[in-house]
A protein has these predicted regions:
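Phosphate-coordination loops involved in phosphoryl transfer and adenosine-cofactor binding
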Residues: 2, 171
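Active-site and donor-binding regions of nucleotide-sugar-utilizing enzymes
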Residues: 3-166, 177-189, 198-201, 209-211, ...
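Nucleotide-activated donor-binding/catalytic signature segment of Leloir-type glycosyltransferases, i.e.
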Residues: 217-232
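Short acidic-hydrophobic, aromatic-tinged amphipathic segments that line or gate anion-handling sites
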Residues: 151, 228-232, 311-314
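A donor-sugar binding/catalytic signature common to diverse glycosyltransferases
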Residues: 231-281
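C-terminal alpha-helical cap of glycosyltransferases
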Residues: 346-363
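Leloir-type glycosyltransferase catalytic cores
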Residues: 282-349
Length: 363
């Protein structure tokens, strides 16, 4: 008999993780049907609700979506209760209110909220609401109640990224990754573009999200006629010797690929001030955060020798990034990259699929 699996995947990355999980389930020859809210183009299956209207950035941006969210929250909960398993991936602000309304369905949270960074109360809340918590960071369990049903399932990027053990050769190509949200791009891409203009001996490649392929890129990025465009992040990054990126997750991706990286993040001032008051972290790049914990058992350790990659937040200009590029510590980067891969150990898709298979057998 076919099992019904509900999936809630709002963000682009969450849909990629969901796809890998679904592929691993199919490799086990399990009979199942997928329902929920996810990207039809990525999952290659019809969804009952589209996540496109709910992808926002920042504290103030989400306010505009509240009326629409309340309209479908009950519908999503009702759909989940018609399924055998409900899997919620990332996006805790979106998912937790839905989970609270679900009864008599096994609830799994995959890609847990970063309670180690802010809103620590969510750890106890999710432990109460969910049947299983699937963590993708080795130290996450230390921030949850001891009686929580939480386990480390591996990191999904080790499934998705052809990480490299060899040092990059000089290719004269540099990747620009200013984010996937339009507000990110608006704030950051003009600075990245200026960087590209001031390093004329390198070829710069703008890596755009795949779902931008049919959109007006000039409307999103502005004038980009002198910059090559790519919609294939991993294939493109493998050809690059350096990257400028905007997100903490992207730094983990580039590090696993062996691409020396600089992180730069700029948002609306209101959002920045709110985040600064709530988030108590020394770093925002995941590679830096993970290594901080690996070496010091403390994600806020001030005595970390040096970050594996430089980080620039809010108050910087193109010249700041250029100076960091010219002074980058390549030797330390490649040494710490190996430490990071060893720390994460393995990917998560197969482990999660096996857990679901065991649930099928025991039901």
């Amino acid at each position: 008999m076919s099992k019904k699996i509900f999936i809630s995947a709002i963000e682009y990355s969450a849909n990629i993780h969901a796809l890998k999980l679904i592929q691993s389930l199919r490799n086990l020859n399990l009979n199942f049907e997928i329902y929920g809210i996810f990207d039809e183009q990525i999952i290659n299956q019809k969804s009952q609700f589209s996540p496109n209207d709910f992808r926002v950035m920042g504290f103030s941006g989400i306010v505009k979506l509240i009326p629409k969210y309340f309209d479908i929250k009950n519908k999503l909960a009702h759909l989940a209760m018609q399924c055998d398993i409900a899997i919620f991936i990332d996006s805790s602000s979106f998912n937790i209110p839905i989970i609270k309304k679900i009864q008599n369905t096994k609830i799994i949270y995959y890609i847990l909220p970063q309670v180690w960074a802010w809103k620590g109360y969510r750890a106890k809340l999710l432990s109460t609401l969910c049947d299983e918590l699937w963590g993708i960071i080795p130290f996450e369990k230390d921030y949850y109640p001891k009686d929580s049903n939480i386990c480390y399932v591996g990191h999904p990027l080790l499934d998705e990224i052809p990480y490299s053990n060899t040092k990059k050769q000089n290719t004269n190509k540099i990747a620009l990754m200013p984010g996937s949200r339009k507000s990110e791009i608006k704030n950051l891409f003009p600075i990245f573009k200026e960087v590209s203009q001031k390093i004329p001996d390198k070829k710069f490649i703008l890596i755009a999200p795949k779902n931008f392929q049919n959109k007006n890129l000039k409307h999103i990025y502005g004038e980009i006629e002198n910059i090559e465009i790519s919609f294939e992040p991993y294939n493109t990054l493998k050809e690059c010797e350096f990257a400028f990126v905007c997100s903490g997750t992207a730094t983990l991706e580039t590090t696993l690929l062996g691409i020396p990286t600089i992180l730069a993040y700029k948002t609306r001032m209101l959002d920045f001030l709110i985040a600064k008051s709530l988030v108590k972290l020394k770093f925002i790049g995941l590679a830096n955060i993970f290594l901080s914990y690996k070496y010091h058992k403390n994600i806020n350790k001030k005595k970390l020798q040096a970050p594996i990659h430089p980080e620039f937040l809010q108050f910087f200009n193109a010249q700041s990034l250029i100076d960091a590029y010219h002074n980058f510590d390549y030797e330390r980067f490649f040494k710490e990259k190996e430490s990071l891969i060893n720390y994460l150990e393995y990917g998560s898709a197969k482990i999660c699929a096996n857990k679901l298979q065991n649930f099928y057998k025991n039901k």
